[in-house]
Amino acid sequence: MAHKKAGGSSRNGRDSAGQRRGVKRFGGERVLAGNILVRQLGTRVHPGDNVGMGRDYTLFATVEGTVKYEKYTRKKKVQTRVHVVPAQA
């Protein structure tokens, strides 16, 4: 016979790695064309001037310049938009 009662097994003990989403370039930072500005799920931040959006909603710069975020009101909702102000040649 066993001298100790069998211990129960836990159903916890798992965790997945984070997906590294969030703002990658903040307002006022200089960026090159192709630099990623925001990684997100859905359009929490909308693309503005000189900003493209990938199929996973990643926002990226299409020109070299300076990042600028703005809040704007659309209907009854305040949304955030990100622009890249082109560098002076």
Swiss-Prot record:
<dbReference type="GO" id="GO:0022625">
    <property type="term" value="C:cytosolic large ribosomal subunit"/>
</dbReference>
<dbReference type="InterPro" id="IPR001684">
    <property type="entry name" value="Ribosomal_bL27"/>
</dbReference>
<dbReference type="GO" id="GO:0003735">
    <property type="term" value="F:structural constituent of ribosome"/>
</dbReference>
<feature type="region of interest" description="Disordered">
    <location>
        <begin position="1"/>
        <end position="26"/>
    </location>
</feature>
<protein>
    <recommendedName>
        <fullName>Large ribosomal subunit protein bL27</fullName>
    </recommendedName>
</protein>
<keyword id="KW-0687">Ribonucleoprotein</keyword>
<dbReference type="Pfam" id="PF01016">
    <property type="entry name" value="Ribosomal_L27"/>
</dbReference>
<keyword id="KW-0689">Ribosomal protein</keyword>
<comment type="similarity">
    <text>Belongs to the bacterial ribosomal protein bL27 family.</text>
</comment>
<dbReference type="GO" id="GO:0006412">
    <property type="term" value="P:translation"/>
</dbReference>
